[in-house]
Amino acid sequence: MSHIQFPYRRESTRRQHSSPDNGDFVTGSSHNDSMTSEPAAQAAEAAGPAGTTTGPAPSPALLEALAGRRPARTPVWFMRQAGRSLPEYRALRARAGVPMLDACLDPALAAEVTLQPVRRHGVDAAVFFSDIMVPLRLAGVGVRIEEGVGPVLDAPVRSGREVGELVARRFGDGPDAEGVGAIEEAVRRVVVELGSPQAPGVREGLSERARAGLEHSAGSAGWTPVLAFGGAPFTLAAYLVEGRPSRDHLAARTLMRADPDSWDRLMTWCARLTGEFIATQVRAGAAAAQLFDSWAGSLSPRAYRERVAPYSALALDVARQAVSPTTGKAAPLIHFGTGTARLLGLMRQAGADAVGVDERIELGEAIEALAEADPQAGACPVQGNLDPAL
């Protein structure tokens, strides 16, 4: 969506080291004081008679930042939308009494959980409530979330034969294929409440606090974007090979080196699967998306560059083909990883519009590393950096 944006000039990224740490957010490519507005006279040029502005309404802060522009406020959201800090979330899960993956495939439940942080805190985006294991389930893979453990696979995939059997499956072909429609319905329900450039959000039946949160979130744009997400190919592959969470991902890294052909088939399948999962959310109305790589930090830069990055690029390419009915365009994409300070340049080169970082790297250092990785591309928006201990 086009908008009015006054020009600014970029200053040295070295000033970023004085930037304060913010919460989970996307910031423009030059954070804090490193973007300065041109003279106010230019504002008059963008105004019509009697001071009325010309052109369409402004974009939400998240979309402004992802486009590399400096928004009026730093967009903030819950990185993990299933926020156990929210009493209404805990109460809802207790009442529903269903396993995590089943909750993700219940449109009413998924939509309600997605909306809770926006209503309570007025955050700038609603991360769609789901799990990175959902696309595996929707391809007929036996997987469950065990309390205190995490994702557990019924049958790990560790041989060429097992990989061959797995990659014959397709997104939406499994016994839970109707779950694809459930995801689409849940996203549409969220968009109805959060609004879009075409229609304001529905507020009937909500508490005063919830309406206030939604109004703050919508801001001057008048609507709040839904953020789609999916697990990166390496993270999905690591779970598939290990069978459960692992500290060192030894089995996955062994397959990567001992059987590169099977690794290629596995990663290609994971990339297309998670890309289509994200695309499904976008086609239903999500306006932006994030590829989430929980385990890439366990890899060396060389291993990541040669055996992982091409597949992350493929997943992003698949996701980028989807057009959001909310904005009428492809969703901007964030590539986030944990413990990936040494990989930031490679993550950017995979093709995302912004790169996410965890608390183990300063924002200024991340911005400089990303700029050095591709000087011709210019500065890159950066997201994240809040220490979970806070």
Enumerate the language-model features and the residues they cover.
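Structural preference for beta-strand elements that scaffold enzyme active sites
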Residues: 71, 77, 125-127, 225-227, ...
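Alpha/beta enzyme core
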Residues: 246-289, 301, 309, 313-321, ...
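Active-site-proximal, glycine-rich beta->alpha crossover segments in alpha/beta enzymes
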Residues: 144-277
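Active-site beta-loop-alpha junctions enriched in small/polar residues
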Residues: 79-81, 131, 229-233, 294-296, ...
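Active-site-proximal loop/short-helix segments
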Residues: 132-143, 223, 227-253, 280-307
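Alpha-helix-loop-beta-strand connector modules within alpha/beta enzyme cores
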Residues: 181-197, 221, 302-329, 368-370, ...
